[in-house]
């Protein structure tokens, strides 16, 4: 059952020009990203059959974010978020063209260097895109906007990965890189059409970047709900090594080397298609209240573990694709709903730094997870199926943590206590108590 204030995807895009242009830019840019990813994976597998070589590419895609996020968060909260996104797109256009020189050289370090630069620029773009959404979308439409953004990522993953596999197989790696570079130009053009009407961001010019990070650190300590919400994607990233595992499992189940690029594309398409339906189904059948979002996240961690057990027992491309799709279906619920809850719980002046913090910790955990997959395959001699089994066990841990934290907070609220700014009478919807008891609870809070 949906809320009265709920809005559909098509209506949101039709009525909100600014968000529509942001969304168009996302569609084009992410299509190119997945073309790029499939081309890079195929190139590395052509140069090396080492699990660590693939893990190195994944770490090059992830770890630069950890180093760049402290700078990016401050920049996003100080400078026009629209300007940050356009500059990032234009610079990435130049960097991606550098991949055209890699195939002839056949040097892994050059691939890693280009990936590091490209991802560092993405470290500015993604927090800016996340932080600008509340200034373009009314509060009551934030869950829909986040669900649409998450579903778009999923569709572009499915379509872009499949297209990438076809393009690389038929036209070669160079064509995929050229198309990817052009998508950044188109994305920048769409974003340039967004009117500069962001909400004012508080800028204390006397503060340096370090002081501003201390400020947001104090905010997160005082607001444990926001802190834990910003760590949920890191919990999801515990099993992020699936990014390294997918190409390795594709090679394991496909006997023909000529089918490898297409097989990787199929698996990543399954990953994208699965992620489309998670938030959509929850929103359609259960609504989008904060309580629904909270418990959907908890359930999704445990259901994701079940899907990884299925992956661990897969022996062909189609059952493997089904397991990957199921895993990302539940992962998308965690991703989209945690972002929406952060938007609803965090003042605008902190959003850039909070999303940068979230991205930094998540990518650090994901980088470690991908390195762990490569190490387990190369050094420990584990099979891809055995690694997937360990992932199934690990993803249960953040689910237990979130369930325990949620139970603790709701118990405190039932007792009339506050947890940060979340109080028994809480407009964010964390309040688990019936409205008829508001007067009784408010009196209890005042007495304390």
Model-derived features with residue positions:
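Juxtamembrane intracellular "pre-TM" segments in multi-pass secondary transporters
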Residues: 2-20, 197-231, 438
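Primarily residues marking transmembrane-helix entry/exit sites
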Residues: 15-23, 51, 108-112, 212, ...
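Small-residue hotspots at the loop-to-helix junctions and early N-terminal turns
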Residues: 36-39, 43, 48-55, 147, ...
């Amino acid at each position: 059952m949906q809320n009265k204030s709920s809005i559909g995807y098509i209506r949101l895009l039709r009525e909100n020009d600014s968000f529509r242009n942001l969304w168009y830019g996302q569609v084009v840019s992410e299509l190119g990203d997945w073309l790029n990813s499939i081309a890079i994976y195929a190139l590395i597998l052509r140069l090396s059959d080492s699990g660590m070589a693939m893990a190195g590419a994944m770490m090059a895609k992830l770890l630069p974010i950890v180093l760049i996020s402290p700078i990016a968060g401050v920049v996003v909260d100080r400078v026009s978020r629209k300007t940050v996104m356009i500059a990032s797109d234009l610079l990435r256009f130049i960097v991606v063209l550098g991949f055209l020189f890699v195939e002839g050289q056949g040097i892994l370090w050059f691939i890693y260097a280009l990936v590091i630069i490209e991802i560092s620029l993405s470290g500015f773009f993604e927090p800016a895109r996340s932080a600008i959404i509340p200034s373009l979308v009314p509060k009551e439409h934030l869950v829909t906007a986040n669900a649409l953004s998450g579903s778009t990522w999923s569709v572009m993953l499915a379509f872009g990965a499949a297209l990438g596999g076809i393009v690389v197989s038929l036209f070669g790696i160079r064509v995929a890189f050229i198309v990817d570079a052009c998508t950044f130009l188109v994305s920048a053009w769409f974003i340039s059409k967004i009117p500069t009407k962001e909400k004012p961001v508080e800028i204390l010019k006397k503060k340096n970047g370090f002081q501003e990070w201390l400020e947001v650190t104090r905010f997160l300590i005082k607001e444990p709900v926001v802190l834990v919400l910003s760590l949920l994607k890191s919990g999801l990233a515990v099993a992020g090594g699936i990014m390294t595992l997918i190409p390795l499992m594709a090679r394991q189940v496909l006997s023909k080397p000529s089918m490898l690029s297409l097989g990787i594309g199929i698996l990543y398409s399954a990953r994208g298609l699965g992620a489309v339906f998670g938030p959509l189904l929850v929103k359609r059948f259960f609504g989008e209240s904060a309580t629904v979002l909270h418990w959907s996240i908890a359930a999704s961690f445990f259901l994701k573990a079940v899907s990884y057990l299925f992956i661990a027992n897969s022996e062909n491309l189609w059952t493997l694709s089904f397991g990957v799709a199921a895993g990302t279906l539940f992962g998308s619920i965690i991703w989209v709903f945690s972002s929406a809850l952060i938007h609803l719980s965090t003042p605008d002046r902190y959003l850039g730094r909070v999303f940068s913090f979230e991205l930094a910790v998540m990518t650090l955990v994901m980088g470690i997870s991908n390195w762990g997959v490569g190490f387990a395959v190369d050094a420990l001699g584990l099979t891809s199926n055995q690694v997937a089994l360990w992932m199934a066990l690990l993803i249960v841990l953040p689910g237990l943590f979130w369930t325990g934290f949620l139970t603790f907070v709701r118990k405190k609220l039932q007792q009339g206590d506050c947890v940060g700014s979340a109080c028994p009478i809480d407009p964010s919807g964390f309040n688990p108590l019936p409205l008829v008891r508001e007067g009784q609870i408010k009196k209890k809070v005042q007495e304390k």
